[in-house]
Amino acid sequence: MEVLYSISKTLKDARDKIVEGTLYSNVSDIIQQFNQMIVTMNGNEFQTGGIGTLPIRNWAFDFGLLGTTLLNLDANYVETARTTIEYFIDFIDNVCMDEMARESQRNGIAPQSDALRKLSGIKFKRINFNNSSEYIENWNLQNRRQRTGFVFHKPNIFPYSASFTLNRSQPLHDNLMGTMWLNAGSEIQVAGFDYSCALNAPANIQQFEHIVQLRRALTTATITILPDAERFSFPRVINSADGATTWYFNPVILRPNNVEIEFLLNGQIINTYQARFGTIIARNFDTIRLSFQLMRPPNMTPAVNALFPQAQPFQHHATVGLTLRIDSAVCESVLADSNETMLANVTAVRQEYAVPVGPVFPPGMNWTELITNYSPSREDNLQRVFTVASIRSMLIK
């Protein structure tokens, strides 16, 4: 993997900087590194493809070295370099696609394609290493079963979940009370509602709670908390739990009371925030507990009082909500996030070349299913294919 990254970094630098008119002295270090790569690769043969519809291709390396000059690089010099660079880039592209198409239940962190296994041989260690990539650094740590750390922005840590629970259910009488939520990606939105606006609740207060367990623990997370759940702020028709009927939801938004956010790790509370909105941090957690209250307003103007009558029918439904959004965090496991296209790159290659469903990844690389059942085998394979995708993205956009 280190060799694959180093070759790609060398090719990227050469493609960007070996251009007509450039002084040789300005790119001599790159050319020297480029020539070392050629010397190491010459005389070797590789084969890629042969999975799904990815075609089998054979690769042979026999290229001349780039020479020295005291002057600027001319068109002939650059053309010779370009021919070599384009062949190498095509080779790296196919090695990466071959690797992204493969998976293994055992030791999925290790190279799976014949070409990348061969590149892992001792003879290729002479290629100048450049291990500045976060993915390469973490791949090396994971390969040695040491602790890794990925920095994510808006990590896709929550499997998609959209549902509701009813604590009071009288749909025929238009009198419901409960919680509805939408968890997806890096965001939780949860709303508590009471059609009667806590009319007969103790002290005219309804208590709501929403607990979310993460599939992987996060550390040093920056989180935004808002006293609203905008996705539940407009009327809708909702199917009953048994699918036998539907019920109408017509929310009127109130501000939640006694909001408390708890972050837990292995059942122990690590951080607690009460009535705190905006930006907060959480040190280390694998569970989030949100609790909040709906309080019937003790004093109401006639207009508000008309919204929340003392008896049925309840045409407007008191609703309070919270939004929790993970803006950034560190995780020991690789995840998809909003700043990267690794999941999309891997999925696109597997779809384009009709890669058959294997023993590890779900059909279509369905992220909700993948993260819901995030096994060690999936973690190893995902880290490997994401690392390869990050290498490929240096050369292929």
Swiss-Prot record:
Tree of life domain: Viruses
Binding of Ca(2+), residues: 266, 286
Subcellular localization, as worded in the UniProt entry: Virion
Chain intervals for the UniProt region annotation (Interaction with the inner capsid protein VP2): 62-73
Residues annotated for Zn(2+) binding in this entry: 153
Main localisation: virion
Gene Ontology cellular component annotations, sorted alphabetically: viral envelope; viral intermediate capsid
PTM description: The N-terminus is blocked.
Signal peptide segment: none
InterPro entries named in the record: Capsid_hemagglutn, Rotavirus_A/C_VP6, Virus_capsid_a-hlx_vir
GO molecular function, one term: host cell surface receptor binding
Assembly information from the UniProt record: Homotrimer. Interacts with the inner capsid protein VP2. Interacts with the outer capsid glycoprotein VP7. Interacts with the outer capsid protein VP5*.
Other comments on record: The VP6 trimer contains a zinc ion located at the center of the molecule. The zinc ion is not essential for either trimerization or transcription activity of the DLP. Zinc-depleted VP6 has an increased sensitivity to proteases.
Family per record: Belongs to the rotavirus VP6 family.
Protein name (Swiss-Prot/TrEMBL): Intermediate capsid protein VP6
